Amino acid sequence: MTDGRGDLRVSGRPQPSASTRIVAVAWATAKVNRLPTILGYNLAYLLVGVGVAGGVAVDDLDLLAAYGLGVLLVKSQASIADAVHDRETDTENPSKSSVARSVAVLGRERALSLLVTELVVGLGLFGLVSTATGEPLYLAVGGALALAGFWYSYPPRLKEVGVVNHLVTTGADVVTGVVVVPVLLTGTVGRETLVVTTAVFLYAFGYHLVHQAADVYYDRHARVDTFARRVGTARTVGYAAVATGAAAGLCLALGYPGATAVTLGAALWYVSLYREVRREPLERQSELLADRFSVGAVATLLNAAMAVSVLLGLSDVSTVV
């Protein structure tokens, strides 16, 4: 039926237009894939790897693009798996409720179909890189990344295996973004790669910790037994400050003033957050961190600073290794 203006109505409510529905589905797809969060910092990870490799030849751009897209797709399908599995829990968490709503917009079956499609295409790209190079390493990396993403939300649920969760998720980010790229482009991993990788691992470990700390109040109510819930919000942020401060020290030793300044700034900011939340009640702690901290923005800034520093000053790394 229609009202006087010609708007379609069901039960007295105007129905959204086709274009509105398309936009809603597109945005929901981006949200369940966490693209607004992961796209920037994963691109920056890739650039760190390119810098450590000493650049990329024009002939290798297609392989690098295939590899990078494969990483993004396999990580994205893991985000969908987590969104579907934790939909009820996320509904109660203001910082994640939009993800739960996005799952509802898509529907569970459509979300799972998208997951399978991304997984197949992503692994196919890893296979393509392995075929082109004659090295099974890249397909193995893709398979390991897919398993880690699945196990994050489903048994053995890495998110509930204490600090092992952060070691695995941070390691997966850093290995796929920083370690494998030089192997793809040069065939080797130099000592300088290991030094840069250690710095990146430390600050990435830090922002993974703070990201989880923001959910402690809601995880407790949902009985999700995370590392941050076990040790407490403030202490988790304190650990992040220590790890990021150590990364700043490595950046200084590497002769990267830009990365040093940004990483040290992040460490000092974490100290400020620690001081702010430590005497607050648990719910307020989660609210403060959710308001102040965005893992996408922080990770992109830190990785971009490191990428620029490595690309501009790679030759200086050899002086400390």
Where on the chain are the PLM-derived regions?
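Haloarchaeal acidic low-complexity proteome signature biased toward cell-envelope/secretome components but also
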Residues: 1-32, 289, 321
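Intramembrane alpha-helical segments
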Residues: 22-28, 100-188
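Acidic (Asp/Glu-rich) catalytic motifs at the cytosolic membrane interface
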Residues: 70-100, 203-227
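Functional transmembrane core segments of multi-pass inner-membrane proteins
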Residues: 51-62, 169-216, 220, 234-235, ...
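Extended hydrophobic alpha-helices typical of membrane-associated regions
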Residues: 235, 259-321
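Multi-pass membrane catalytic core of lipid/isoprenoid biosynthesis enzymes
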Residues: 92-136, 225-256
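Membrane-embedded alpha-helical segments that form the functional core of polytopic membrane enzymes
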Residues: 46-84, 136-150, 189-210
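Small-residue-rich segments of transmembrane alpha-helices in multi-pass membrane proteins
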Residues: 40-51, 166-183, 228-236, 288-308
